[in-house]
From Swiss-Prot:
It is found in: Cytoplasm. This is Isoflavone reductase homolog. Keywords: Cytoplasm, NADP, Oxidoreductase. CDD domains: PCBER_SDR_a. Belongs to the NmrA-type oxidoreductase family. Isoflavone reductase subfamily. GO terms for cellular component: cytoplasm. The keyword Cell inner membrane does not apply. The active site is at 133 (proton acceptor). Its EC number is 1.3.1.-. Its main location: cytoplasm.
């Protein structure tokens, strides 16, 4: 049997990237992270860089805007995982061009890690970001690059500390805002589990040219259920303030960045139901907890305990 794939990360020091890099190294993959000199010398990244070094991660000097450095880095590996942030999504075409030239990549994971962008009903500004991700998918497919798209839905560490309250610094004390009627199911995943599931998919033929949906059964919940679970844990009832879609849309239009971004993403999930309003067909996707039943994921019930 062939050894484990060598993996190159672009955006590996970012929010979700660091969890996937760690999962890669811990799973025994030769793990490479493309970094600029400025990242290595950035004091805010020192601790993370040291942690990566302790895992045996190799840093490769390069830049998304330096074609030669990209091609050189890509030629050392089998798999490329992009976890670049919102501002760099469109510039992944540069990465795709380098992958195409290098000619050796067995799998490319573009920066997704959210909704399935081909199955959304979004309004601006979320719509623009989703459209960019969808355009990147089409370029990958047109170039014939083998791929896996990872749909993770909500990051638990982002959305659960404040019970998915837009813009709130912590959990609600007396009142809780619920977008829509509160009975639409959404998905929340722990970042470490996202890392584990993503790395499991790297060498798996079942995820080749497919979407990997991370939708474990105990991580699918409505806002009403989430609030009830929180009330049970804290022993304190909250007044529920329901915001109809018309008002949600108005709030999005009136809000500034980043509040409007967060609200528009929550709108797709909690009002439109875009996490759970379609069936996963074998022709285009697989569900992570079904294909990797041995992964012990953290259910929402357990994740919430750390915020009580």
């Amino acid at each position: 049997m062939a050894g484990k794939s060598k993996i190159l990360f672009i955006g590996g020091t970012g929010y979700i990237g660091k969890f996937i890099v760690e999962a890669s190294a811990k799973a025994g993959h030769d793990t490479f992270v493309l970094v600029r000199e400025s990242t290595l010398s950035n004091p805010t990244k020192t601790k993370l860089i040291d942690t990566f070094k302790s895992f045996g991660v190799t840093f490769v000097h390069g830049d998304l805007y330096d074609h030669e450095s990209l091609v050189k880095a890509i030629k050392q590996v089998d798999v490329v995982i992009s976890t670049v942030g919102h501002a760099l999504l469109a510039d992944q075409v540069k990465l795709i061009a380098a992958i195409k030239e290098a000619g050796n990549v067995k799998r490319f994971f573009p920066s997704e890690f959210g909704n399935d962008v081909d199955r959304v009903h979004a309004v601006e500004p979320a719509k623009a970001a989703f459209n960019t991700k969808a355009q990147i998918r089409r370029v990958v497919e047109a170039e014939g690059i083998p791929f896996t798209y990872v749909a993770t839905f909500f990051f638990a560490g982002y959305s659960l500390p404040n019970l998915a309250q837009p813009g709130a610094a912590g959990p609600p004390n007396d009142k809780v805002v619920i977008l829509g009627h509160g009975n639409t199911k959404a998905v929340f995943n722990k970042e470490e589990d996202i890392g584990t599931y993503t790395i499991n998919a790297v060498d798996d033929p079942k995820t080749l040219n497919k979407i990997l949906y991370i939708k474990p059964p105990h991580n699918i919940i409505t806002l009403n259920e989430l609030v009830s679970l929180w009330e049970k844990k804290t022993g304190k009832n909250l007044e529920r303030l329901y915001v109809p879609e018309e008002q949600v849309l108005k709030n999005i239009q009136e809000a500034s960045v980043p509040m409007n971004v967060g609200l528009s993403i929550y709108h797709t999930a909690f009002v439109k139901g875009d996490h759970t309003n379609f069936e996963i067909e074998p022709s285009f996707g697989v569900e992570a907890s079904e294909v990797y039943p041995d992964v012990k994921y953290t259910p929402i019930d357990e994740i919430l305990n750390q915020y009580v």
